[in-house]
Structure formats: structure tokens, C-alpha cells
């Protein structure tokens, strides 16, 4: 037998410093071109026997105690190894006889330039068949690593057994096919850096992770689920969401409802499908928005500190069960939006931080790479492979889980280099400015690709500053989102409604100001989880007055919200006036529905959603100034606001009259453009909802009395802390 392996290569192998263990292990033709040599590295083995086509051959360990080899006269073909060690005897396939790869030269090229939109099909862990043998193909990007191994129960979490090879044609990808593994296998990567330091890391591209506090990745097959939402996807692709009603129910799955009889455990994805979907459908919401369900280690982050970007959290079940949840949403006519967090990630040792011993996913300079306020790290959007990781991730959720949209969290933190930083704590861009040019480019590319691949999808920005053109396409200089949270409306409106009605006349502009800029962007009016945490209290708790007035104020707020241009988002619990501040560790207080006023509030929101989705004037022209005009916004003393919403058909118009004080006006006159009978189609003060039941007996005939610049008018009864909605009855009706 010719000793064709240099001692330095053996030393590199046994010290986990070899970049290509295939150069030593597996079958090799001898230097003289005659016999073949088979080698295997089996630390701790006392005996190894090769079982091949020509029978059994005992392997020798002459050159190193753990390196076994034998000569065979011809190519060994398919063989197995019988290994004897302190744990007994086992029969295994040799991972190093499989030299195939799922990576092509094109894959490496596209990944290096940041344009591999399905890189998740190549990196990570994938069940595969090589040479007729089933197993799992592993691949990981770690360009600065000296050595990478796969760890798991299958090798007693010993990094010496399954060392990966560095792919020559890539930018630092390591790969290995391990036979006889399959779905459900728990694994990690052991990464040795240039200084010899060893890190155990979860797989950034894993499709499933262990339930915290464990941190292993789990092999999952995403091709097993059979979808039944084809019709929904076809309709979505042909739709324009800006012209459709969007009534979004924002949910934190871990605290919407729990099972107190079983240790207050979470509901599973299957149980949530059984309970949450019918509940949302009954209330008339069109979409569910999920606070981040991407895998995260800390419950208290609500999901906003993500480590497993490609894995739905194991808190509620497995990937297939989450697919079924989305599928059942679609079959019930409900869309699914995911909160997505590309702005930052946590520092947990098993995660992305210092992944290969260097600042791989984050900036090396803490002035660019760390959010001091949040204690998290910032992605390096200027690195192609990092940008590819994030963009492919967003596309992955649309492609593999059929989601309908994403809400991108903390966009402002991405756009500004000096976000939450003092002088000297940030680095200017190449022009000396504070704009993060790489993040801007990333967001534009992200949105262009989402709408290229998934027409009719939603990409919503949570952007809290006055950054221009957030919802305009990149070719016009915009960021490319199609919707943005209306943070200004939320701030001003809540400030107004927190004020005692006696003093609201002094905050009149809080209601009118948002209209001056509401058509500069495509907005979502969001009363979100952010408004009911951190000592802010509940939404009903913000309302002034006695018990009756609190509920009346909240009904008036919601009615005004649904009348104001923009799509709608309500956080869970608001629909029945949840009494206490949201606590992510507890279920909502569902027992409140035993009380009439909370049950009536829920009934009110159900009716409001029916009004909204049934009246095109409330959604068709949300982003067009032609869809709104003030009739009267100057009644400061009475805190009354009157406006009209119009649809694509100008004759489709609704008149809103909102009284934000507890004063009842039995003879209040408002101008209308057209003569005829104006039907009262909604009254927030109806006794059905717990109001005082002041109204107009179903409607009013207009009078030839000009007011508010309109040729006709209505003399109506205006209820206290109430909003009325009128629709002119057409002649043929």
C-alpha cells in the first residue's frame, strides 16, 4: 500500500484544521494507478472492517491510531463500515464515499453577488439521495472558518467525525452529505476559527429549530404538505390591495389564548387554526398579522429578536402544522401577514453573532454594527451574501408558506446611521450624510423582488420618521413598499382621545392635521401592540370619563379610524376593550366577554368591519385625495367633525358626522352635496352597542338649506360621543 497521504495532512485532519477531508478520507486510487485505498477516521475505534462487494477487509491504523485504511484491488463501489469502539459495534455508511454536491458553479456565483433568490434550497440541511442512499446534505456559509463539522446524536456531538469540505468554487461555503440521517435529526455546526477557537452554531438556514432553551437545528422536509389554496393565490395575484378592504387583526400567538387547565400552555398551530381563524372570520377582519413567529430564543422579545429566520417557532408546532394554519386561513378567506425583522438580531452565542469567528453577518465596527439601546447587532447590508440571506428569507415565506405580506419592523433604525446614537457613536456614509445607503439599496431590492414574484402581495413599513417616498417605487426614488404604518395619525389621534372632552377644543388640529399629508404615502392606520405595553395601559384605559364614557369614546375612536383614509389594523383584545395592559406571558382576559359592555364592544367591531368591507367608498380611494373631503372641520367649540368618503364611483359616498364630546345635539345641521333621502347606515351610539340610542330613526330627507359650502343640508340628532354614517339612497332604491 502506498502511503499517499502526507503526515501534515493527517495532522490537520485529526486536529480539525483540514479544509478538505475528502482529500484523505473515502476511496482513493493509489499513486501507481493500480489498487484503491479506502480510509476512514474513527476516533476511539478499536477495530474497523470494510464490508464491500468482495467481502470483509480489516482496516489497519498504522499511521495514526484513529485513521484506518485498507487496499482493495478495484474501485470499492458501495461499501459499509463496521466500527467497534467503547460504545459497542455499529454498521455505518461512509460519508466520505459520497462526493456529490447540491451546489453548482452558478449557485456560488449568484450567492456571491447577492442574487440567489432560492439559496435556502442549497444552504442548510436537505434530505437527499446520493448514489441510491438516503441521507441529509448539509451546507453552511463560513468563509473565515478553518474547519467546520456537523454535530448531532449520530456522532455523539463530536466534531471529529463529520468534518465538512470547503467548496472551492464558492465564497466560503462548506458542505457534506451524511448518509442514513433524515427528517427530525437534531444538529449544529462546529466552527473552528483561525485562532483555534471553537463555536457551536445553529444553522442560519434551518427550516426548524428545537424548542427553547435548546438551540439545536432540526432537519425538516418542506415538500410533504399538500396545499389547497390555489384559488386564493390566483385571486391574490390579480388583485390590487390598495383598492381592496384591509382590516387587519394583529395577533401575538403566545398570548391570544392559552390552556390554563394544562399549565397555561400555548395553543398549537392546529388549535389556533380551530379557534383563531373562525373568531377572526366572524368579526369580519380580512387579514391576520402575526407578531414574529420566526424562531427566537427569548419569549420576552415577543419574537422581535430572531435567530431562526427560516424556521417557524417550535413553541406552537412544526413547519407542516404552520403551513396548514396558513392554508386554512386562505380557505376561510383570510390573508396572513408576518412581522419580519431585518433591522437587527440578538447576540446569543449559538446564533449569527461572530458566526465564523469574525463579524460575518454584522458590521465589525460597533458604531455601525450594534444597537446599544436594544442590545442587538445590525446586519451588514453592504455585504452581498448577508443581503442575499435576508432577501431570500422574505421570498422564502411567500414561496414555501404562501404568506400574503410582510410588515417590516423598525425601518427607521435601518435608514439612519445615527438612529438612537449620540455624536461620535456613528459613522457617516461616503457622502458625509447619516442615511444608510446600503440599507436603502437592500429595501429597494427586497420590494422589487417581492412584487416581481408575488403580485398582489403586501409589503408594509413600520417607519416612524418623515422619510419621503416610502411607498413609492424605486424608479421614482422610493423605497418600494406598498403600505406604511401611519404613525403620525396614531400619535395625534390617541393624544386627542386621551384628553378630557372638555379640553378637546384645544387639540382640534390633532384630528385634522393627518389629512394634510395622508395622501403623500399609502397608509395603514394601526392601533398596534406598541400602544398597549410599557406602562401605556390598555386602549380602553386611555379613554377619559366614567365607565360609559370610556366605551363611548372608544366606539367613537374606532368609527373615526374606519372613516379616515387608510387601511386598518387593530391589536388583539382591542375588539372587546381588553381592560389591562397587554402581557405577553398571559392569555387575554376572555372572561370579560361575560360582561355586557365588553360583549357589546365586540359586537360593535364586528358591525364596523361589516360596514367597512361592504362599502367601497371606505377603501377604493384610500390613497387618492378624491376619496375624501371635509364638509366641516371648523366646529372647534363643539368638537364635531364632518367629512365625506368617496369610492371609485363618485356617487358612492358616505357622510361621517363625529361628535367627540358627551354633549347631545338634538338639532345639528350639516351640509350635503346632493338632495334626497340620506339613510343612517351606522350609529356608534346605538343601544345595541351600549350607547344612549340617540339617532335619526333610520335616516333623513335633505332640506334646501345651504350650509358648509353645500347646497343642501340635514338637520340631525347628533348623539353624545358618537359617530353617525349616512349614505344617500339612490332614486332606483
UniProtKB/Swiss-Prot annotation:
Query: Looking at the keywords, is Chloroplast present?
Result: no
Pathway per the UniProt entry? Glycan biosynthesis; glycogen biosynthesis
Gene3D superfamilies this protein is in? Glycosidases, Golgi alpha-mannosidase II, Immunoglobulins
InterPro entries listed in its UniProt record: A-amylase/branching_C, Branching_enzy, GlgB, GlgB_N, GlgB_N_E_set_prok, Glyco_hydro_13_cat_dom, Glyco_hydro_13_N, Glyco_hydro_b
Protein's UniProt keywords contain Transferase? yes
Which keywords fit this entry according to its UniProt record? Carbohydrate metabolism, Glycogen biosynthesis, Glycogen metabolism, Glycosyltransferase, Transferase
The record lists the catalysed reaction(s) as:
Transfers a segment of a (1->4)-alpha-D-glucan chain to a primary hydroxy group in a similar glucan chain
The GO terms this record gives for MF are: 1,4-alpha-glucan branching enzyme activity; cation binding; hydrolase activity, hydrolyzing O-glycosyl compounds
Query: Which SMART domains does the entry link to?
Result: Aamy
The protein's assembly and partners:
Monomer.
Family membership noted in the UniProt record:
Belongs to the glycosyl hydrolase 13 family. GlgB subfamily.
HAMAP family in the cross-refs:
GlgB (MF_00685)
Q: What is this protein called?
A: 1,4-alpha-glucan branching enzyme GlgB
Amino acid at each position: 500500500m502506498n502511503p499517499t497521504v502526507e503526515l501534515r495532512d493527517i495532522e490537520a485532519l485529526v486536529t480539525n484544521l483540514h479544509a478538505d477531508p475528502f482529500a484523505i478520507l473515502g476511496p482513493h486510487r493509489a499513486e501507481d494507478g493500480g489498487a484503491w485505498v479506502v480510509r476512514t477516521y474513527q476516533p476511539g475505534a478499536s477495530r474497523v472492517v470494510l464490508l464491500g462487494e468482495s467481502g470483509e477487509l480489516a482496516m489497519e491504523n498504522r499511521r495514526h491510531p484513529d485513521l484506518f485504511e485498507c487496499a482493495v484491488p478495484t474501485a470499492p463501489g458501495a461499501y459499509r463500515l463496521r466500527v467497534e469502539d467503547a460504545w459497542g459495534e455499529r454498521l455505518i455508511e461512509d460519508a466520505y464515499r459520497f462526493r456529490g454536491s447540491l451546489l453548482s458553479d452558478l449557485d456560488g456565483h449568484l450567492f456571491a453577488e447577492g442574487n440567489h433568490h432560492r439559496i435556502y434550497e442549497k444552504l442548510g440541511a436537505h434530505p437527499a439521495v446520493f448514489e441510491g442512499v438516503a441521507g441529509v446534505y448539509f451546507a453552511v456559509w463560513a468563509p473565515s472558518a478553518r474547519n467546520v463539522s456537523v454535530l448531532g446524536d449520530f456522532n455523539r456531538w463530536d466534531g471529529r467525525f463529520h468534518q465538512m469540505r470547503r467548496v472551492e468554487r464558492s465564497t466560503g461555503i462548506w458542505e457534506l452529505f451524511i448518509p442514513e440521517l433524515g427528517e427530525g435529526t437534531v444538529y449544529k455546526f462546529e466552527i473552528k476559527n483561525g485562532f483555534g477557537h471553537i463555536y457551536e452554531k445553529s444553522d442560519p438556514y434551518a427550516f426548524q429549530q428545537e424548542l427553547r432553551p435548546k438551540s439545536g437545528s432540526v432537519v425538516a422536509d418542506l415538500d410533504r404538505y399538500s396545499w389547497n389554496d390555489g384559488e386564493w393565490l390566483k385571486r391574490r395575484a390579480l388583485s390590487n390591495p390598495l383598492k381592496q378592504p384591509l382590516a387587519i387583526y394583529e395577533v401575538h400567538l403566545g398570548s391570544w389564548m392559552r390552556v390554563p387547565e394544562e399549565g397555561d400552555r400555548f395553543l398549537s398551530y392546529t388549535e389556533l387554526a380551530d379557534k383563531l381563524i373562525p373568531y377572526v372570520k366572524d368579526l369580519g377582519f380580512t387579514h391576520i398579522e402575526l407578531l414574529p413567529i420566526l424562531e427566537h430564543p427569548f419569549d420576552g422579545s415577543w419574537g422581535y429578536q430572531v435567530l431562526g429566520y427560516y424556521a417557524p417557532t417550535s413553541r406552537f408546532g412544526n413547519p407542516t402544522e404552520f403551513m396548514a394554519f396558513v392554508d386554512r386561513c386562505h380557505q376561510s378567506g383570510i390573508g396572513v401577514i408576518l412581522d419580519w425583522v431585518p433591522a437587527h438580531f440578538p447576540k446569543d452565542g449559538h446564533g449569527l453573532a461572530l458566526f465564523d469567528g469574525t463579524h460575518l453577518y454584522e458590521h465589525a465596527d460597533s458604531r455601525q454594527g450594534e444597537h446599544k439601546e436594544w442590545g442587538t447587532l445590525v446586519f451588514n447590508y453592504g455585504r452581498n451574501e448577508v443581503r442575499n440571506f435576508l432577501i431570500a428569507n422574505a421570498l422564502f415565506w411567500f414561496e414555501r408558506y404562501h404568506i400574503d405580506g410582510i410588515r417590516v419592523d423598525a425601518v427607521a433604525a435601518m435608514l439612519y446611521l445615527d438612529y438612537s446614537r449620540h455624536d461620535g457613536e456613528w459613522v457617516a456614509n461616503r457622502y458625509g450624510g447619516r442615511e444608510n445607503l446600503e440599507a436603502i439599496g437592500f429595501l429597494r431590492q427586497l420590494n422589487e423582488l417581492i412584487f416581481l414574484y408575488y403580485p398582489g402581495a403586501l409589503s408594509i413599513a413600520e417607519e416612524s420618521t418623515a422619510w419621503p417616498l416610502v411607498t413609492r417605487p424605486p424608479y421614482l426614488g422610493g423605497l418600494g413598499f406598498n403600505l406604511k404604518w401611519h404613525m403620525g395619525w396614531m400619535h395625534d389621534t390617541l393624544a386627542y382621545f386621551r384628553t378630557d372632552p372638555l379640553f378637546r377644543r384645544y387639540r382640534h388640529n390633532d384630528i385634522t392635521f393627518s389629512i394634510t399629508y395622508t395622501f403623500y404615502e399609502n397608509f395603514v392606520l394601526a392601533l398596534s401592540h406598541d400602544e398597549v405595553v410599557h406602562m401605556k395601559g390598555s386602549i380602553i384605559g386611555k379613554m377619559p370619563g366614567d365607565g360609559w364614557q370610556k366605551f363611548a369614546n372608544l366606539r367613537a375612536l374606532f368609527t373615526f379610524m374606519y372613516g379616515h383614509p387608510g387601511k386598518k389594523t387593530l391589536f388583539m383584545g382591542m375588539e372587546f376593550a381588553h381592560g389591562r395592559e397587554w402581557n405577553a406571558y398571559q392569555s387575554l382576559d376572555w372572561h370579560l366577554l361575560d360582561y355586557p359592555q365588553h360583549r357589546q364592544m365586540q359586537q360593535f367591531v364586528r358591525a364596523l368591519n361589516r360596514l367597512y368591507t361592504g362599502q367601497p367608498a371606505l377603501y377604493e380611494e384610500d390613497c387618492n385625495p378624491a376619496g375624501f373631503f371635509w364638509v366641516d372641520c371648523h366646529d372647534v367649540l363643539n368638537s364635531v367633525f364632518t367629512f365625506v368618503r368617496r369610492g371609485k364611483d363618485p356617487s358612492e359616498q358616505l357622510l361621517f358626522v363625529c361628535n367627540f364630546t358627551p354633549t347631545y345635539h338634538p338639532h345639528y345641521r350639516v351640509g350635503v352635496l346632493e338632495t334626497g333621502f340620506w339613510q343612517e347606515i351606522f350609529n356608534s351610539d346605538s343601544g345595541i352597542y351600549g350607547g344612549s340610542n340617540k339617532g335619526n330613526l333610520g335616516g333623513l330627507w335633505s332640506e334646501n338649506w345651504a350650509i358648509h359650502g353645500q347646497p343642501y343640508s340635514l338637520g340631525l340628532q347628533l348623539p353624545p360621543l358618537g359617530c353617525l354614517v349616512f349614505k344617500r339612497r339612490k332614486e332606483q332604491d
